[in-house]
């Protein structure tokens, strides 16, 4: 299965079709993804295990196992794992016209990525 390790954890690509892309994302304890948005895709997140702390357009939301959230195109968002010991695992379904990693516009990033 194709995937990539990142400073905050790892993702695996479960499906990569022309009209959608599906990833299984694991966020290590006390890590978070960048605060970002996308020009060409929306995202649906479903929590598999752990507690997700989501920021969506500056609003804080907590999601537990089996909870989900929709991230519209252009919406600023981030997800964080506040657990000190357990991984956060969620499924991300991307819908849109382009799914390249270069459609990530980072507003803030703990790892100084652009």
PLM region descriptions:
Residues 1-5, 78-114:
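Double-stranded beta-helix
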Residues 1-37, 41:
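A short glycine-rich, His/Asp/Glu-containing loop-to-beta-strand
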Residues 29-31, 40-41, 59, 75-76, ...:
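A generic "binding-loop/recognition-motif" signal
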Residues 33, 59-61, 103:
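Short beta-strand segments
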Residues 34-36, 54-55, 71, 77-84, ...:
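Short beta-strand His + acidic residue motifs that chelate non-heme Fe in jelly-roll/DSBH
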Residues 40-53, 57-58:
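Glycine- and acidic-residue-biased ligand/ion/polar-headgroup-sensing regions
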Residues 58-76:
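Short acidic-glycine-tyrosine-enriched beta hairpin
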